[in-house]
Amino acid sequence: MADADVDVGPVQPKKRTFKKFSYRGVDLDALLDMTSEELVKLFHARARRRFQRGLKRQPMALIKKLRKAKREAPSGEKPEPVRTHLRNMIIVPEMIGSIIGVYNGKTFNQVEIKPEMIGHYLAEFSISYKPVKHGRPGIGATHSSRFIPLK
């Protein structure tokens, strides 16, 4: 049994390959370098219409606040959260890495913007209702519920 020495040699660990992010076939670096006109062409119809009609004062103010928060953040740190009520704001590549407090009608839910969120609305990441947890039927829900004994 001692004669069965098998020389395996240095074992190299497998290199992990990560999926490179792309939005509609365009990688993230190219998205960040695009002009707004080129970027709008990649969005879905509703978002294209929204951007073609122009960004009004409030969405532009949010983007300016996000730029300021990123600029003032120390390198390697996350920027300060920026609170907003603009649930209908469409996420653009410039916002990636920012933290936004999106108002849901009661509280501000902090959302960290990731590349996968491009083209979506802020509201999609801050749910404004409490999902229903269906339980037992109440009294008077159906005719047969009259015969359900009360606890």
Swiss-Prot record:
Q: Which UniProt keywords apply?
A: Ribonucleoprotein, Ribosomal protein
State the GO CC annotations.
cytosolic small ribosomal subunit
Q: One Pfam family, short name please?
A: Ribosomal_S19
Query: In its UniProt record, which GO terms are filed under biological process?
Result: ribosomal small subunit assembly; translation
SUPFAM superfamilies hit by this protein: Ribosomal protein S19
| Gene3D superfamilies associated with the record | 30s Ribosomal Protein S19, Chain A
Q: Which InterPro entries match?
A: Ribosomal_uS19, Ribosomal_uS19_CS, Ribosomal_uS19_euk/arc, Ribosomal_uS19_SF
Instruction: Please tell me whether the keyword Ribonucleoprotein is annotated for this protein.
Output: yes
Q: Which GO terms describe its molecular function?
A: RNA binding; structural constituent of ribosome
Q: Which PROSITE patterns match?
A: RIBOSOMAL_S19 (PS00323)
Q: Would you say which domain of life the source belongs to?
A: Eukaryota
Q: Which family does it belong to?
A: Belongs to the universal ribosomal protein uS19 family.
Protein name according to UniProt: Small ribosomal subunit protein uS19
Q: What is the gene called?
A: RPS15
